[in-house]
C-alpha cells in the first residue's frame, strides 16, 4: 500500500499486510486457551512446527533485510505474554518428563532470546528503525513485566531448569547443543537484566514491576543468583565459554548502585534518605528565595523601559521592572541581554546506551538491597577471582566471543566490586568497634579474595588499555579504566593499613611497581590536562584519579626517601639522535656511540624520584581549568567531591606557591559566588568553612600581588603561560641558559698505514666521498683556492714593498651555508680533514659557531699543493683492496679524551673528612694528594706482585693485627705526605675582596721590614759582620732516607728533625723569598771573626741532610755573582775541617739496595757574606 497516498482518516500500514497475515496465522496456529478451562493453555497440533516457522521469519526476514517488521507483528500479537510464557508454565507443571514438551520449551526459549534482545540504536538508522524502535522498547518492558510477575509460576526458574541437564554434563562430554542451551539460558538472563523503562516514553502500568529492585528480587527468589554463583566459581573448569556472558549479567545488575547505601543497615539507610530529602527541600527553598528577589510584584503588570547612562556618555536601553531595584541589578540585566555567538565545536553526540551509562543512580528498596548485598558478599568470597581472571585472559587474547564493549564492562565491574569489598571491610570494622561479639572472634580476612586484579598482569593490561583509549579518544572506555585504577589504588592503600603483615608487604610491593613507571605518571597528567567537554562522568573520574594518585604518591615518597622511577625519555631521544646522526658513522666510532647509547639508556631508565618536581606538573593552566570545570558543578557535588577540588586548589596556591594561576576573573568570580552567592554553598555543610577560608586567602593574596605587580590587573583577563607566571611571581623574566653541545670525538688516521700528511689527506677524502660528503670536501677545496689567491696577492705586494715585511694575515674560513656551518662542529671527519690541511680554530672553546682560520705560516704554494691533492682525490676513483676498508683506518685519537682528563683533575681531590682523625693534621685540612705517575705505579704494582709470589710459599698469611698495622702505617704515610703539599685549590673568590685597614697595616709592616733589611745589609757591607736574623733558622739535610732506615735513626736525630719541622711550620708566615741566616751560616767571614754565635752552631751541623735540598736549590743567577769564585774556594776549604764523619751505622750498608747512600753536606750558598736558603720544601 502506498503510504504517502493514504488518507488522513485511515491508519498508515507500517508493516506489509502479507507479512502481518503470515505471522498472525502462525501465532494463531500455535495454540490458545480452551473455552472449558480458561486458565489452561492448549497447544495446537503443530505447535513445534509453528515455533520453528516463527524463528525462521525472524531470522530470514528481519535480520537478513535489516528490518523489524516481524518483531513488530509478534509484539502486536502478544506472542510472549499470551503464548510463550503459558507454554513454559505448562511444561514446568506437567510436561518435564515428556521429550516432546521439552523440545517445545526449548523452542520457546529460542524465541524469547531474540525478542528480548536489547535494541541497539545503529549509527545509520532507516525509516523502518525509527518507526518500530519505540514500540518494541515498550513491548520489551511488557515482556519483562510478564516474565518477572507471571502469576504464581517462576519463569526464570523454568528457564534454568531447561539448562540444568546441559550443566550436569561434564565439560569434556558436552556437545555443541549443550553449549548452545547454556548460552541461550545466560543470554535470556542478561536480556532481562538489561531491559529498563525508557524515560522518554510513557510507561504503561507500575514502573516498580520492571525496576532494578524487582529484577534483583526475582533473581534471588527464582535461584538465578545461585546459578550465577555456581557458574562464576567454576568458570575456569566447567564453564570456560560462558565467562563473558556472566560478566555482562553482573555489570547490568550492579551498575549505578550506590555501594555505601548497599552495606548500610535499615537505620542508617533511613537516616541517609532523611538527610537527602532535607537537602533537596533546602535546595528548593534557596531557589525560591533567589527567585523571589527579582520576581515580579503584584502590581508589576505594566511594561517598563529605561535609559541607562554609562560612564562614556553613551545611553543603553533596558526593559523590565526588575531593573528598577538598584544599579547593580540594572547592569546585571544589561549583561544578560548581551549575546555572544561562541563558535561551538561540532562533536558527535554521545549516545547514552545501557553499556556506558555509569553515572545514573539507581535506588533500591530494602528487600532488593538485602538480596543484592547477600549476593555480592558471596560472590566476593567465591567467584571474584575465577571470573575476572578468566575474562581478562580472554580479552587479552582477543577471543571470538569478546566484543569491544566487554572491556569497558570488565573495568567498571572490577571497580564496583573492589569498592564493595572496601566498604564491607569498613562496616565490619565499625561493627567490631561497636562491640559485636560475633565479629570479634573472627580474624580479619586478607585481601586474597580480590588478589586476581592486584597482580602484575592486570596492571600491564590496565596501563595498555588506558593508553590505547587515551590515544584513540575513547571517552567511555577511558572513564571505566580510570575508575578501576582509582579503586585499585584505594584498595592498595587499605591493604597497607591492614593488621596482617603479609598484606602490608604485598601493598608495598604493589605501590613500588605502580609508582616505578614514569609513563604512568605522565599518562595521568596528560589525562587531566586533556579534558575538554567529555562530560561530567569523565571529569569526575579523572579528578578523582589525580587526587588519589597524588595523595598516595606523596605518602609513599615520604616513607621511601630513596625512591627511584624508570624513565624512558632520554633513552628514546638519544636513540632517535643516533639513528639520524649518520654523518659520524664509521665502524669504530659507531661502536663507541652504541656503548654511549647503552650507558645513556641505563642512566635514563632509572632516576631518583622528586615529588615536588612531579607535583609541579599539575601546576599549569590546563589542569586548573579541568578542576575549575569540575568545581562549577558545586551545587550537585557531595562532600567528598568538594573536598577533592578544595585540596587541589590548596596545593596549587599554598604548597606549590603558584596562586598566580588562580588569578583570573572567571575563577575569582566562581569562588566568590560559591561563598557569597547568588547560589552559594550551603553554609551548614562541613566543607563550607574550609572553602570560605581558602577563598579568603586567595583573594587576599591576589590583592597583595596586585600592589606588587600592577601588570596583574591586565593579566586577570587571560590564562597564564609559564613566562607570565614566573614574571608575576618574581618580578623579572626567567633567565634560561642553553646547554652547549659537546664536540665529537677527535679522530686520527692510523699512523701505521699512513706516514705522511698527504697520504692521510687522501684517506680522509676517500672516506668522506664514500660517506656521500663530497660537498664538504669541495667546500674545503674552494676555501683553499680562495685562501691561496689571497695569500699570493699578499706575497706579491710584499715583494714590491721595500720596508720591513709584515707577517702574513690570517684568513678566516667561511662556510657557504648553514649545514656546512653545523658540519664544521658536528662532523668528526670534516674536522679531521680541516686539521690535516692545517686549518686552525681560534680560541680554546670548542663550541658551535667557533671560528676557523688559515694560519699565516701557510704560503700560497702550500695551499696550492694541498688543494691539488684534494682535487686529485675527487677526480680519481677510489681504489682499495677488497680486504681493507679505508674507513677502518680512521680511529679515535688515543690519549686525547677531554672528558677523562677533566674527570682526572678532580678524581683524586680529598676534601678532608669530618672524622676525629683529621684534627691531628698540622696544616689543617688535607690538600689534594700528590699521586704517583701511572708508569711508576704500574712498575711498583708489578714488583709487589712478584714479591708476593716469592713469599707465598715461604711465609704464612698475615693475621688481622698485621694487616691492621700495615693499613695504619700506610694511612700515616699518606697523611704525612699530603700535609706537606700546598695547593691552589683553596684560593677563593673572596680572597680578592679588599680591606683598606688591613692593606694599610700590611704595607706598614712591609715598609718596616724593608728598612730593617736595608740596615742589616748596609752594616754587613761596611763591617763584614752578619747579625742574627732569626732564632728560628732552619737546617737542611743532604741525603734522602728511605722508610726502611727511619726506624734505625737515633732518638736525638728524630727529635732534632721534629724541632726543625715545627720551626718551619711556625715560620710559614715569614717572607717566602730569601731567608738570610747568620748564626748558623758557615761563611768564611763569620768564621774569621770568631763570632760566639757560631760556637753552638756546630752542634746541629752533624745531622745528615736529605737530597730534597739539592732538588730545591735554585740557580745562582742573582746580582751577587762577583763573590761566586770566592765562595767556591772558601767552601772547599771548609768542607774538610768542619764536616764530621758520619756515624758508622749510616755508612756500613753501602752495597745494600734498600739502604740509601748518604751524601756529604753540600756547601752553603753565599751571597755577599749571607747564606741564602729557601724556606719551602
Swiss-Prot record:
Keywords: Cell cycle, DNA damage, DNA repair, DNA replication inhibitor, Meiosis, Nucleus. The keyword Cell cycle applies. Residues 1086-1096 have a biased composition (Polar residues). This is Topoisomerase 1-associated factor 1. One of its GO terms (biological process) is replication fork arrest. The keyword Cell cycle applies. Pfam families: TIMELESS. It comes from Neosartorya fischeri (strain ATCC 1020 / DSM 3700 / CBS 544.65 / FGSC A1164 / JCM 1740 / NRRL 181 / WB 181) (Aspergillus fischerianus). Forms a fork protection complex (FPC) with csm3 and which is required for chromosome segregation during meiosis and DNA damage repair. FPC coordinates leading and lagging strand synthesis and moves with the replication fork. FPC stabilizes replication forks in a configuration that is recognized by replication checkpoint sensors. GO terms for molecular function: DNA binding. It is found in: Nucleus. One of its GO terms (cellular component) is replication fork protection complex.
Amino acid at each position: 500500500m502506498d503510504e504517502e497516498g493514504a488518507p488522513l482518516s485511515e491508519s498508515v500500514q507500517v508493516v506489509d499486510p502479507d507479512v502481518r497475515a503470515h505471522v498472525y496465522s502462525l501465532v494463531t496456529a500455535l495454540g490458545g486457551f480452551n473455552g472449558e478451562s480458561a486458565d489452561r493453555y492448549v497447544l495446537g497440533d503443530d505447535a513445534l512446527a509453528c515455533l520453528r516457522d516463527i524463528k525462521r521469519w525472524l531470522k530470514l526476514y528481519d535480520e537478513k533485510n535489516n528490518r523489524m517488521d516481524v518483531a513488530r507483528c509478534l509484539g502486536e500479537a502478544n506472542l510472549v505474554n499470551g503464548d510463550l510464557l503459558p507454554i513454559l508454565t505448562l511444561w514446568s507443571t506437567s510436561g518435564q518428563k515428556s521429550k516432546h514438551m521439552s523440545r517445545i520449551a526449548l523452542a520457546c526459549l529460542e524465541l524469547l532470546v531474540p525478542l528480548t534482545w536489547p535494541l541497539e540504536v545503529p549509527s545509520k538508522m532507516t525509516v523502518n528503525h525509527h518507526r518500530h524502535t519505540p514500540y518494541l522498547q515498550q513491548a520489551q518492558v511488557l515482556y519483562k513485566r510478564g516474565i518477572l510477575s507471571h502469576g504464581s509460576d517462576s519463569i526464570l526458574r523454568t528457564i534454568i531448569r531447561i539448562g540444568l541437564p546441559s550443566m550436569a554434563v561434564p565439560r569434556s562430554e558436552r556437545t555443541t547443543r549443550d553449549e548452545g542451551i547454556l548460552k541461550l539460558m545466560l543470554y535470556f538472563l542478561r536480556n532481562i537484566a538489561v531491559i529498563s523503562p525508557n524515560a522518554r516514553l510513557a510507561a504503561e502500568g507500575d514502573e516498580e514491576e520492571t525496576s532494578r529492585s524487582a529484577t534483583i528480587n526475582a533473581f534471588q527468589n527464582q535461584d538465578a543468583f545461585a546459578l550465577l554463583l555456581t557458574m562464576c566459581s567454576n568458570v575456569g573448569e566447567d564453564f570456560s565459554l560462558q565467562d563473558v556472558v556472566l560478566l555482562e549479567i553482573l555489570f547490568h545488575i550492579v551498575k549505578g548502585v550506590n555501594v555505601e547505601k548497599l552495606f548500610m543497615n535499615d537505620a542508617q539507610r533511613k537516616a541517609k534518605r532523611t538527610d537527602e530529602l532535607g537537602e533537596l527541600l533546602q535546595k528548593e527553598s534557596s531557589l525560591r528565595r533567589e527567585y523571589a528577589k527579582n520576581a515580579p510584584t503584584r502590581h508589576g503588570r505594566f511594561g517598563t523601559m529605561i535609559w541607562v547612562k554609562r560612564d562614556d556618555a553613551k545611553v543603553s536601553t533596558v526593559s523590565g521592572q526588575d531593573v528598577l531595584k538598584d544599579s547593580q541589578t540594572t547592569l546585571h540585566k544589561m549583561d544578560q541581554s548581551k549575546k555572544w555567538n561562541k563558535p561551538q565545536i561540532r562533536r558527535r553526540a554521545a549516545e547514552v546506551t545501557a553499556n556506558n551509562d555509569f553515572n545514573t543512580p539507581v535506588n533500591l528498596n530494602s528487600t532488593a538491597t538485602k538480596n543484592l548485598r547477600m549476593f555480592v558478599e558471596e560472590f566476593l568470597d567465591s567467584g571474584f577471582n575465577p571470573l575476572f581472571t578468566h575474562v581478562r585472559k580472554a580479552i587479552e587474547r582477543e577471543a571470538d566471543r569478546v566484543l569491544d564493549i566487554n572491556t569497558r564492562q570488565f573495568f567498571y565491574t572490577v571497580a564496583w566490586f573492589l569498592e564493595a569489598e572496601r566498604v564491607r571491610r569498613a562496616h565490619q570494622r565499625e561493627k567490631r568497634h561497636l562491640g559485636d561479639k560475633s565479629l570479634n572472634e573472627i580474624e580479619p580476612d586478607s585481601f586474597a579474595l580480590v588478589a586476581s586484579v592486584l597482580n602484575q598482569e592486570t596492571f600491564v593490561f590496565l596501563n595498555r588499555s588506558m593508553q590505547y583509549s587515551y590515544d584513540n579518544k575513547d571517552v567511555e572506555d577511558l572513564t571505566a579504566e580510570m575508575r578501576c585504577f582509582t579503586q585499585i589504588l584505594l584498595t592498595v592503600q587499605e591493604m597497607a593499613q591492614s593488621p596482617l603483615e603479609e598484606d602490608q608487604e604485598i601493598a608495598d610491593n604493589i605501590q613500588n611497581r605502580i609508582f616505578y613507571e614514569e609513563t604512568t605518571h605522565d599518562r595521568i597528567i596528560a589525562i587531566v590536562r586533556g579534558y575538554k567537554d567529555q562530560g561530567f562522568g569523565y571529569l569526575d573520574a579523572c579528578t578523582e584519579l589525580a587526587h588519589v594518585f597524588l595523595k598516595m604518591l606523596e605518602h609513599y615518597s615520604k616513607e621511601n626517601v630513596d625512591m627511584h622511577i624508570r624513565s624512558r625519555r632520554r633513552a628514546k631521544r638519544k636513540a632517535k639522535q643516533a639513528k639520524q646522526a649518520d654523518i659520524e658513522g664509521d665502524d669504530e666510532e659507531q661502536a663507541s656511540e652504541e656503548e654511549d647509547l647503552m650507558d645513556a639508556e641505563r642512566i635514563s631508565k632509572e632516576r631518583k624520584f622528586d615529588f615536588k618536581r612531579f607535583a609541579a606538573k599539575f601546576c599549569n593552566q590546563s589542569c586548573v581549568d579541568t578542576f575549575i570545570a569540575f568545581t562549577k558543578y558545586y551545587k550537585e557535588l557531595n562532600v567528598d567531591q568538594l573536598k577533592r577540588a578544595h585540596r587541589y586548589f590548596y596545593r596549587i596556591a599554598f604548597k606549590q606557591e603558584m596562586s598566580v594561576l588562580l588569578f583570573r576573573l572567571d575563577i575569582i568570580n566562581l569562588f566568590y559566588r560559591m561563598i557569597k552567592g547568588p547560589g552559594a554553598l550551603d553554609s551548614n555543610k562541613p566543607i563550607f568553612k574550609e572553602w570560605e577560608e581558602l577563598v579568603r586567602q586567595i583573594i587576599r593574596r591576589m590583592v597583595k600581588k596586585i600592589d606588587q605587580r600592577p601588570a596583574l590587573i591586565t593579566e586577570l583577563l587571560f590564562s597564564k603561560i609559564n613566562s607570565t607566571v614566573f614574571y608575576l611571581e618574581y618580578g623579572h623574566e626567567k633567565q634560561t641558559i642553553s646547554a652547549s653541545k659537546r664536540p665529537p670525538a677527535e679522530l686520527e688516521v692510523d699512523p701505521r698505514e699512513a706516514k705522511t700528511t698527504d697520504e692521510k689527506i687522501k684517506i680522509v677524502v676517500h672516506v668522506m666521498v664514500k660517506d656521500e660528503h663530497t660537498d664538504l670536501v669541495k667546500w674545503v677545496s674552494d676555501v683553499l683556492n680562495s685562501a691561496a689567491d689571497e695569500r699570493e696577492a699578499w706575497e706579491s705586494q710584499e715583494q714590491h714593498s721595500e720596508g720591513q715585511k709584515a707577517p702574513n694575515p690570517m684568513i678566516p674560513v667561511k662556510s657557504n651555508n648553514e649545514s656546512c656551518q653545523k658540519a664544521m662542529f658536528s662532523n668528526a671527519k670534516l674536522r679531521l680533514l680541516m686539521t690535516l690541511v692545517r686549518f686552525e680554530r681560534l680560541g680554546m672553546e670548542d663550541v658551535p659557531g667557533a671560528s676557523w682560520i688559515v694560519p699565516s705560516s701557510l704560503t700560497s704554494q702550500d695551499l696550492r699543493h694541498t688543494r691539488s691533492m684534494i682535487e686529485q682525490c675527487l677526480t680519481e676513483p677510489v681504489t682499495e683492496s677488497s680486504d681493507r676498508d679505508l674507513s677502518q683506518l680512521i680511529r679515535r685519537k688515543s690519549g686525547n679524551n677531554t672528558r677523562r682528563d677533566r674527570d682526572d683533575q678532580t678524581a683524586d681531590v680529598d676534601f678532608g673528612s669530618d672524622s676525629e682523625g683529621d684534627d691531628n693534621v698540622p696544616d689543617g685540612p688535607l690538600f689534594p694528594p700528590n699521586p704517583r705517575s701511572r708508569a711508576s705505579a704500574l712498575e711498583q704494582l708489578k714488583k709487589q706482585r712478584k714479591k708476593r709470589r716469592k713469599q707465598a710459599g715461604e711465609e704464612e698469611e698475615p693475621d688481622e693485627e698485621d694487616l691492621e698495622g700495615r693499613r695504619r702505617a700506610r694511612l700515616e704515610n699518606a697523611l704525612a705526605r699530603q700535609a706537606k703539599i700546598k695547593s691552589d685549590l683553596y684560593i677563593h673568590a673572596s680572597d680578592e675582596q679588599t680591606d683598606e685597614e688591613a692593606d694599610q697595616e700590611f704595607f706598614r709592616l712591609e715598609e718596616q721590614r724593608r728598612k730593617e733589611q736595608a740596615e742589616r745589609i748596609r752594616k754587613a757591607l761596611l763591617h763584614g759582620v752578619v747579625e742574627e736574623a732569626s732564632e728560628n733558622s732552619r737546617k737542611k739535610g743532604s741525603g734522602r732516607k728511605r722508610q726502611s732506615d727511619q726506624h734505625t735513626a737515633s732518638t736525638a736525630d728524630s727529635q732534632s728533625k721534629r724541632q726543625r719541622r715545627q720551626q718551619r711550620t711556625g715560620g710559614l708566615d715569614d717572607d717566602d723569598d730569601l731567608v738570610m741566616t747568620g748564626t748558623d751560616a758557615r761563611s768564611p767571614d763569620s768564621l774569621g771573626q770568631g763570632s760566639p754565635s757560631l760556637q753552638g752552631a756546630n752542634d746541629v751541623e752533624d745531622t745528615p741532610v736529605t737530597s730534597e735540598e739539592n732538588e730545591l736549590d735554585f740557580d745562582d743567577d742573582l746580582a751577587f755573582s762577583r763573590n761566586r769564585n770566592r765562595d767556591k774556594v772558601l767552601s772547599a776549604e771548609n768542607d774538610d775541617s768542619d764536616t764530621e764523619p758520619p756515624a758508622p751505622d749510616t755508612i756500613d750498608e753501602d752495597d745494600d739496595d734498600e739502604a740509601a747512600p748518604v751524601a756529604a753536606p753540600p756547601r752553603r750558598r753565599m751571597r755577599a757574606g749571607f747564606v741564602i736558603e729557601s724556606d719551602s720544601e
